[in-house]
Amino acid sequence: MLTGEKFAMQAVNGGYIGIPYEKLDCQGFVERVLADCGVRKPNGTVYDWRGSNSMYRNYYQWRGTVKECENKYGMIPQGALVFTRKTDGGEVERGYHDGLGNFSHVGIYVGAPHGVIHSTTGGVQFGKFPDAKRWTNVSLLSMIDYTNQNINNNDRDAKQIISEIRALLSKLEEVL
């Protein structure tokens, strides 16, 4: 399975930077990176969403606000999709009646030092993260493994760290 880190690295190193928006919009950019990573639907076809609203609502293992993601996982994992949510009621115009909001833009979080890669009117480029006015929501895709970044393992990791600290303290007591 594709890892979040490999997905992010493909976005950074795949030669997309500078491709004009007219050739690769924000949805198309994410789909292209997934396809270039070899990710396909169970029937063998590439993912073909109906815009960033559809991306936020489908094929996720977790979704929520940036703050909820940081609270739940301790960080935004590399390879997560980040979204711009508008509260203009646009989701109803686009056929959604679930109250989640209108997700008007999507990018791929790639981590420091680049932040986010997304396609805007200036083409595919790096964007600042965090940027509370632009990036409001996060989605972890179901076809990507984020566990390489210790996502979902925070409790186990904390217990392991405490155990290691206790072992080191015990050794220190022996020396003293």
Task: Locate predicted features.
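Short alpha-helix capping/helix-loop boundary micro-motifs
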Residues: 61-72
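Loop/turn elements at helix/coil->beta-strand transitions in domains of secreted/extracellular proteins
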Residues: 77-80, 112-114
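Short, surface-exposed beta-strand/loop "edge" segments at domain boundaries and coil↔beta transitions
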Residues: 90-93, 124-126, 169, 176
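A conserved glycine-rich beta-strand in the N-terminal activation segment of trypsin-fold
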Residues: 104-110
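Short, low-complexity, charged amphipathic interaction modules
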Residues: 153-176
